[in-house]
């Protein structure tokens, strides 16, 4: 299930531009809220993926991407510095990474999960291409957000 509203009864200290997926006045990511109440940002294209990962993501945020092909970068904001994603948020974010990728029409697929601080972009890499220092692989069923809420 994909939700895009704030969790009921959850404390919201107020969004920052980064929490809204906005860079220099331009929306570069879809903003969703996971079942556990965490902000999830989904890149819209290769150039926006670069901005999302390199400019908006904090090193302690979680980063996800389908393992085998092109797709959106997904960033889960982590202001509390959690060491692991809550299970439902991981399932939600990994599903979005698979759903906004070349694997969107397939079944369960592998998704890389890393801390954003372990994601780098070497000089000369094409837009959207990155290199991972450390990551784990999780399996996910593709899902997409309702377009009206993007």
Kindly give the residue locations of the regions a language model identified.
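Duplex nucleic acid-engaging cores and interfaces of nucleic-acid transaction enzymes
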Residues: 2-150
